[in-house]
Structure formats: structure tokens, C-alpha cells
């Protein structure tokens, strides 16, 4: 399958999952704390590697969120997410959602903090 088509399917899956996380998921471990950063669909359309970013705490004194707990909660709802993708995206076979954490936001915050510390 052409790379452009796979990217289009990935973007569509990302749109649906983002919408579901925002509007339908009620789990407090996930709601408002997680965003979808990327979806990579395999060439055979069997899997959609979905990368989730965990938003950092708003205040610096708040404790960090437990990534393992959030990852577990996401894995619990991946069947529901796949069902919603099947309902909204018009493809013959709906890929299995594979949950992966994207730590790029955390890494960017750490780098920014280090740079700010150097300026002081």
C-alpha cells in the first residue's frame, strides 16, 4: 500500500481517537491527561501503533502522574477505541490499536528547564 494512503489512514485514526478521548472517555486516569501525538499504520493494516503523550502536571509542586497506571488504563480501552475507529473510518479491516508512550513532551520540558537553569 502506498505510503501516502497509510499516512492518511493514520491521520484519520488519530482524529477519531483524539475525539473519543476528549468526548467519550470517562476514566479520570486518562481524561484530560493524555493526547495522541502520532499513529503509524503497518503496511498490511493489521496494526496501528498509537503514540500517547501524558501532559505534565500544571503546577511544579504537583506529583507526577504514574505512567504505568495511565498506560494500563489506555490498554484497557483500546478495544473500545478500535470499535469507534471501525464505526468512523471507512476501511475494510480495522487495525488493532497498539498503545505506546511518547516521551518527547517530557524530554522537551526537561531540556527547557536545564536551559533556563543555565541562564540563571
Swiss-Prot record:
MF (Gene Ontology): ribosomal small subunit binding
InterPro entries referenced in this protein's UniProt entry, alphabetically: KH_dom-like_a/b, RbfA, RbfA_dom_sf
Ligase is among the record's keywords: no
GO cellular component: cytosol
Domain of life: Bacteria
Localization of this protein: Cytoplasm
Complex and partners: Monomer. Binds 30S ribosomal subunits, but not 50S ribosomal subunits or 70S ribosomes.
Function: One of several proteins that assist in the late maturation steps of the functional core of the 30S ribosomal subunit. Associates with free 30S ribosomal subunits (but not with 30S subunits that are part of 70S ribosomes or polysomes). Required for efficient processing of 16S rRNA. May interact with the 5'-terminal helix region of 16S rRNA.
PANTHER family: RIBOSOME-BINDING FACTOR A, CHLOROPLASTIC-RELATED
Protein name per the record: Ribosome-binding factor A
Originating gene: rbfA
Amino acid at each position: 500500500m502506498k505510503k501516502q494512503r497509510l499516512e492518511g489512514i493514520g491521520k484519520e485514526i488519530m482524529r477519531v481517537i483524539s475525539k473519543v478521548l476528549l468526548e467519550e472517555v470517562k476514566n479520570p486516569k486518562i481524561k484530560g491527561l493524555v493526547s495522541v501525538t502520532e499513529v503509524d499504520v503497518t503496511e498490511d493494516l493489521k496494526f496501528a501503533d498509537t503514540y500517547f503523550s501524558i501532559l505534565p502536571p500544571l503546577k511544579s509542586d504537583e506529583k507526577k502522574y504514574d505512567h504505568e497506571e495511565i498506560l494500563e488504563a489506555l490498554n484497557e480501552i483500546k478495544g473500545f477505541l478500535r470499535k469507534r475507529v471501525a464505526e468512523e473510518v471507512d476501511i475494510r479491516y480495522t487495525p488493532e490499536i497498539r498503545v505506546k508512550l511518547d516521551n518527547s513532551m517530557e524530554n522537551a520540558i526537561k531540556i527547557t528547564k536545564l536551559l533556563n537553569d543555565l541562564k540563571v
